[in-house]
Amino acid sequence: MDPTSPKNLLVDPGRAREVLSAFSVDPDRPLLVQVSRFDPWKDPFGVIDAYRIVKAEYPDVQLALVGSIALDDPEGVRLLDDLKGAAGGDPDVCVLSNQDGVHAAEVAAFQQKADVVIQKSVREGFGLTITEGMWKARPVVAGQATGCRLQIEDGRNGYLIASTEECAARIVQILSRPDVGESLGREARETVRRRFLSTTHLARYLSLFAQGPMREPEV
């Protein structure tokens, strides 16, 4: 992950609040965020179901599903429309895309203000949006897909879940115990710093090159 990318830079807290407010999201209420393509493999409908379970215990909770969509992607357009229908007019569910003016800086603001970052993927390679949330020191709740397991050590720097009910339970745990969320977030950021930053890997390559050419083995 490139830490100098606009999506990975720290957003001024006041500006982050303004971004959320511009999309009718209350920055003073709990917020769940999933950033992903509008793709069935990301299980966005499962995220909405988990949100509804959480809302029974935390009526003030909000959900933002944030993604990008291409005009020549009819399946993505249909899924976006279906998601808005699944929200059922709930004013606390926000489904946003680049067509709404959500770009890198806005995505960063949503991730930074999230109380919980969700990545409920059924299938996932290396989840860059997981890393982005971890780098912002947010607690991440993710599915059991292979890429998620490469990034998250369950219970140490995030949570891995196998069902909608487990997803909701972990979210409730984080909302009820802010200290748990803070601890997970700290470990998550440190994990990214050590393992997933492009600058860290570049420094390691430079250190290797500085050692000079490798000697040919003697025969």
Regions found by a protein language model. Name each.
Residues 108, 131-135, 146-150, 156:
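Short alpha-helical segment that forms part of, or immediately flanks, the ligand-binding pocket
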Residues 67, 71, 76-109:
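Nucleotide-activated donor-binding/catalytic signature segment of Leloir-type glycosyltransferases, i.e.
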Residues 154-165, 173-178:
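Conserved acidic donor-binding segment of nucleotide-sugar-dependent glycosyltransferases
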Residues 21-42, 48, 64:
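Conserved donor-binding/catalytic core segment of Leloir-type glycosyltransferases
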Residues 130, 139-142, 160:
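Short hydrophobic beta-strand element within catalytic cores of glycosyltransferases
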Residues 180-195, 201-207, 211:
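A short, well-ordered alpha-helix in the C-terminal region of glycosyltransferases
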Residues 115, 137:
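A short alpha->beta transition loop at the rim of the catalytic pocket in nucleotide-sugar-dependent
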Residues 122:
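Aromatic "clamp/platform" in nucleotide-sugar-dependent glycosyltransferases that forms part
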